[in-house]
Amino acid sequence: MHIYTYWGLKYVPSNSTMVAKEGDLILLGNEVHKVVKVLHRFRNITDLQITNWKGTETRYNLHVTEYKVLVPYDTHKEENEAMSDSLITHNGKDYVLCKIPARVGDLIRTEDKRVWEVLQKSKDGLVLYNEEKGEQRSAVYSEIGPYHVLVPRDTDTHTPTREELAAVIMNKAFTRTETQDSQEDTGTHKGLGLTGTDLYHSLRDLDAKVQSGYYTATENEEDVKSEIEATKKHMKAVKESGKTVNDYRKEENTKRCKLKALTNKFNRLFLKSVIDTDSLQVGKAYLIGGRDMKNVHGLYTGTTFDQQHANFLIVETDRMHRTLTVSAEQLFAEERHIVDIEKRVEQTED
């Protein structure tokens, strides 16, 4: 498998024939080593931004038929060479197949290509339901075998900018609903160092998703509408307060100092051989530290299949990133600690 690098991030070709969307990176069929970005698309007529050793150029009105969509590649996943190695469509929706532990409410695909909904989860196995045949069964993990979790593919996927990568580390930039008793992540920015442009983009994206029917459930639509109104009020309050970006940065630095003091005292007990995945959320930022290392912000990307190691994406610049792996033994021996940044900030404010 060939690995392609685009602005410092690694990608591999998808195994499926997924239709490219605006903002996607694709690999042209007749030019094996040319990675291009889709700017606009109308049927097979496409505007492409081409980046190679000669520089960057834009070509308009190209007739593109043979291509493959590129998906993120995680160099530290031995069991699953590509963390998101294929894209599939189920019930009219696009999903990314990821090898991460399933939770209640998730859709999973087993080796026989069947899709199941997770109704219940225990330490021994899962209770599954297949909508296609109306079949429900309980099975231990050994009977289920290897499986992939279906993670919804965002409709506005695009190559992240430096500002967006920073937002992922400092804010909740991913939307994911976990088990009923867990905290829901709605992707709301907390206002830490945000500019008017950040708030405008958040408002525009949410409004567009409501208008396009991206949120189909009534309760979700109401939640998004209320979030849009809350964002408008927040923008108005920021404007009236007269605060500058530097003022927000000072507040952010104050909270960071409080976090630094808290991390010296904070030690969470984990199981000796298995990562406590119920306390970690894919796509969420955590503070990782321990003996002989400085505290760093990392984006949790999942665990190995045996759940003995947790992987975190560390974004250093817009062209450089690395993966940090934390083992269950290190957590049990208190050589490493993982701090939920937002939870600690909320407790500090209370």
From Swiss-Prot:
Binding site for ATP: 237-244
Assigned keywords, A-Z: ATP-binding, Nucleotide-binding
One term of GO molecular function: ATP binding
Name by which UniProt lists this protein: Gene 40 protein
Organism: Bacillus phage SP01
